[in-house]
A protein has these predicted regions:
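Intrinsic-disorder/low-complexity accessory segments
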Residues: 1-9, 14-16, 20, 24-591
Length: 591
């Protein structure tokens, strides 16, 4: 009525479903509130010419104000009904919790950084979480004491807990989504988790309230002395890249150990997983005491585990002075940005990369508009990142220079359509579903002409036809190679990715070029059509190739999605630090 009175055309209950719980129009419904969404087109300045006439900035302010006043007025009139609704809602939530065969959720991770971030999220929503006080084996998976937690469903935040933990299985008649159809948060955080029935929940040894406040940091290693040869940083923790970046920016020498090793420490022998970073205490341009101060920061501020090694010799794994231990350098990152359009970059995708590097890893990022970048910028950087967007503004001359820069040691990282552009330009010998190289497009067009045309359809079904074959945001199960340097820090072979789009990498001649592939049965939560599931089964999500002295690393998806998909961020930081720690296989003789 408000908009009718203003003479403004409006629409309701079209296109925007309330399925995804992250919407402002959905999230309050998990907390006993009645949400309303009012979305308005921007004037993009003072005045914009639209299909409905001129849209003025002052008009948009008036409409927002009138909508807010009308909503508040209606809420005041319906106060008693809203209060009764909220009382019923919480009572119904308690009944639903008791009727649910799932009584609790348990979760754990070898990465206590991601585990801590998830605890903070639950605590921020006033969800009661309890540490497990003894080791538990649930569905064949070990949940270690004090490194695992359990959330019981019978509490005030029942609906929110279910929204966070449950696997999304949309109704069969709902195949069209505005964007996200699956968001199971333990998958997003890369946590092992399990739904517990009444028997399992009753046996779980839950104790003190779980939070990150007051949790003790790992034990400090001994201060340097004549007997401490090097410090070794365990790469398993989410914050390890930040700690290593700080060390590298102090111009210390550091190396990555490619295999699991057994170290001799002042406290005895210690097993350290592959990907650990070695920091020698001697022959550095910094005193041993100053080096130790950085190690103390890594332990106390970043929460990482650091060991003091007494010798280069290891009973198992690479010796610390071995030829397979690769030197690291501080990444100097160039991020392509610019307004989205025919030649522009997704500001969301670029912002997510900036946030991870600048805010979480403390890596400086140079951001240059895609229409202004030139060869001079390349020489000042070790890495260039192209996220989702359009790169038609990059000239053939720049592409040739980029290829030379990569061969000379540069690292190109592409995500989503940034990866598609790299494949099309032939930056590396990597193939992607539905993407043809520029020099092969004519041949591809001939192949398209030979394809069978689709069956005739009714035009009124076109919108659903277009949308149901799109993957707008599901959770896909993946298989990671944790022995590849880009997979260092992961425990086991399972990983979950946010899948948006229908692209994946084809297996090529390099049997080690696919670091992460989609599982044979990839859909873990949300919706993807049977056609897309079959098409993407076993295809690559992360592909990498050495090109001369440099590397090309491509993601079919966005590993930094909305800054909360922590489970795949390690893949991105590995691409920064370990991009030259892998090699191409030797050529095979032709049969």
């Amino acid at each position: 009525d408000v908009f009718d009175g203003l003479g403004q055309l409006s629409v309701s209950q079209e296109f925007f479903p309330n399925y995804y719980l992250g919407y402002g129009s959905s999230y309050p419904s998990l907390l006993g509130a009645v949400p309303f969404l009012f979305e308005q087109g921007s004037a993009r300045g003072m005045v914009q010419d639209t299909d409905n006439g001129l849209k003025r900035y002052d008009q948009t302010i008036l409409e927002q104000f009138q909508a807010a006043v009308a909503l508040l007025g209606e809420a005041a009139q319906q106060r008693e009904r809203l209060q009764a609704f909220q009382q019923r809602w919480f009572a119904d939530s308690s009944d639903k919790a008791r009727a649910n065969p799932t009584k609790a959720y348990a979760f754990t991770s070898n990465d206590q950084g991601r585990f801590a971030h998830f605890l903070d999220l639950l605590n921020a929503h006033a969800i009661d979480v309890r540490f497990l006080e003894s080791d538990q084996t649930i569905d064949g998976t070990l949940y270690p004491a004090n490194r695992s937690a359990v959330v019981y469903l019978d509490q005030a935040r029942y609906a929110l807990i279910e929204g966070i933990f449950a696997v999304q299985t949309p109704p069969e008649d709902q195949v069209v989504f505005y964007d996200i159809s699956g968001w199971t948060l333990p998958h997003a955080f890369g946590l092992k988790h399990a739904a517990l029935n009444a028997r399992q929940a009753g046996r779980s040894d839950a104790g003190t309230a779980a939070s990150t406040a007051g949790r003790s940091a790992p034990i400090l290693p001994p201060a340097p002395g004549d007997d401490v040869l090097a410090y070794v940083i365990d790469w398993s923790h989410f914050n390890a890249p930040r700690a290593v970046n700080r060390i590298l920016r102090h111009e210390l020498r550091a190396k990555v150990i490619p295999d699991p090793v057994r170290l001799e420490t002042p406290n005895g022998f210690v097993d350290v997983p592959r990907g650990a970073v070695l920091v020698p205490t001697r022959r550095q341009d910094m005193s041993a005491d100053d080096i130790y101060a950085l190690i103390v920061r890594a332990v106390e501020e970043d929460g990482v585990t650091v060991h003091a090694s007494l010798t280069s010799r290891t009973p198992s794994g690479s010796d610390l002075g071995g030829f397979s231990v690769d030197a690291l350098e501080a990444p100097k990152v160039l991020l392509l940005t610019g307004r989205a359009g025919a030649s522009g970059v997704s500001d969301n995708d670029a912002g997510e990369v900036w946030h991870y590097l600048d805010q979480m890893l403390h890596i400086p990022v140079t951001m240059i508009d895609v229409t202004n970048v030139n060869s001079r910028h390349l020489s000042d950087h070790t890495h260039i990142i192209a996220v989702g967007g359009a790169y038609g503004a990059l000239s053939d001359g720049f592409v040739d220079t980029l290829k030379s820069w990569i061969r000379d040691g540069g690292v190109f990282i592409g995500t989503q359509s940034g990866a598609e552009w790299a494949v099309a330009q032939g930056l590396a010998d990597i193939d992607m579903l539905g993407v043809e190289r520029v020099d092969e497009e004519a041949e591809a067009k001939e192949d398209e002409d030979e394809m069978d045309p689709p069956a005739p359809g009714s035009y009124e079904d076109k919108l659903d036809y277009d949308r149901q074959e799109r993957i707008t945001g599901a959770v896909f199960a993946g298989v990671i190679d944790p022995t590849h340097p880009l997979g260092f820090g992961y425990d086991g072979n399972e990983i979950f990715v946010h899948k948006e789009g229908e692209k994946g990498f084809e297996p090529g001649d390099n049997p080690f070029g696919i670091v992460v592939r989609y599982a044979d049965t990839p859909l873990a939560s949300g919706y993807a059509s049977a056609t897309n599931l079959e098409r993407l089964s076993g295809k690559g999500m992360l592909a990498a190739a050495r090109v001369g002295a440099g590397s090309v690393i491509l993601f079919a998806d966005n590993p930094n999605f909305r800054a909360y998909w922590l489970g795949t961020k390690r893949l991105f930081s590995n691409s920064l630090f370990f991009a030259r720690a892998f090699s191409s296989p030797a050529p095979r003789p032709e049969k």
